[in-house]
Amino acid sequence: MQFKRVFTVVLDSVGIGEASDAANFNDVGADTLGHIGAFYGEQFKLPNLQKLGLGNIRASDPIKGVPAAQPALGYFGKMQETSVGKDSMDGHWEMMGLPVKEPLGFFPNGFPNELIQKLAAFSGRSVIVNRPYSGTDVIRDYGEEQLATGALIVYTSGDSVLQIAANEAVIPLEELYRICEYARQITIEKPYRIGRVIARPFKGQDKDHFERTSDRHDYTLEPTGTTDMDRLKAAGLDVLAVGKINDIFSGKGITSGVHTESNHDGMVQTIKNAQTDFTGFSFTNLVDFDAMYGHRRNPEGYGAALMAFDQQLGELLAVLKPDDLLLITADHGNDPGFRGTDHTREYVPLLAYSSRLSGNQSLGVRSTFADLGATILENFDCPAGEVGTSFLTQLK
């Protein structure tokens, strides 16, 4: 065991430029970090990410405000996704050695009437919208109708998701969760095979004051095989989940999980883990980048959130011990400067840091996100999974 604890922080949707297969997803030109940097110019400051080597990943095509560090304190590279989709589930499962190879169901024109009728019959409520929509726009446009009628707002996006929004004043949280659990049960198999069912509670009395609450809940497909988290847990190691990690893996392979209210809260919980004595893996997802800024195509808010994270990253670095390893990455892109409102197929950054390592080395372009999980397994002397190549020996 080289490191007693490994911390992985997933910056949800923070891509670093179009992937080699971006054309297959109509995402040529997508560049989440690059376009945020272009929006801010030299005001874009990420000093902690920069010193770890974020700018070194693409020194030949610099991110505005984030030049290459000389030398970088960490190891730097980028990873290519091999899963057939570009959803959070695909990205996280692949990181943990389980690439998604069977396509999920997508419903760009709304869900079939048969499915809608089942939801209406089970809930005793009518269903409105049933088409792709931005989550904030849909409650602005239909929230007052939902509040007046008690209907379910059902909508989707460019991802494999079925989302149900309801005002807590007319549909209590427990009821919304029960409806979503039913929706999950009936959409596991083909012809639906929907990646995630998401409960989207909101509050407020009119469209000028509606806001989504932090009680969102994701009901994902259960992992279709053994993940690296399962392997770590089976070896008796601690596997701590922060944020929506627990939802993404349906609780599998996790010894302790905590939901979070925001990026800030996610980092507070991660720092708390770092101040706790454990042996194993802490896995954090920071979803605000994606949910609040990427889908809403808000480069200003996205950049501000990255700079706020960078400050908290400094706090985390200050409490990490010499036998800790920090890995920072992302699960897909969601370029706020790109067309549409959906995820973008991009490379994701890979940063590795430990205070006892010399750093300043490139990890190159990894051919799958699964290299991250393979590295963690090798560190803890666990049997390797079927996918992924460890880069542990490069960390020296």
UniProtKB/Swiss-Prot annotation:
Localisation per UniProt entry: Cytoplasm
Cofactor(s) the protein needs: Mn(2+)
Cofactor note: Binds 2 manganese ions.
Keywords: Cytoplasm, Isomerase, Manganese, Metal-binding
Principal localisation: cytoplasm
Coiled-coil spans in chain: none
Catalyzed reactions per annotation: 2-deoxy-alpha-D-ribose 1-phosphate = 2-deoxy-D-ribose 5-phosphate; alpha-D-ribose 1-phosphate = D-ribose 5-phosphate
PANTHER family according to UniProt: PHOSPHOPENTOMUTASE
Listed name of the protein: Phosphopentomutase
Species whose genome carries this gene: Latilactobacillus sakei subsp. sakei (strain 23K) (Lactobacillus sakei subsp. sakei)
The encoding gene: deoB
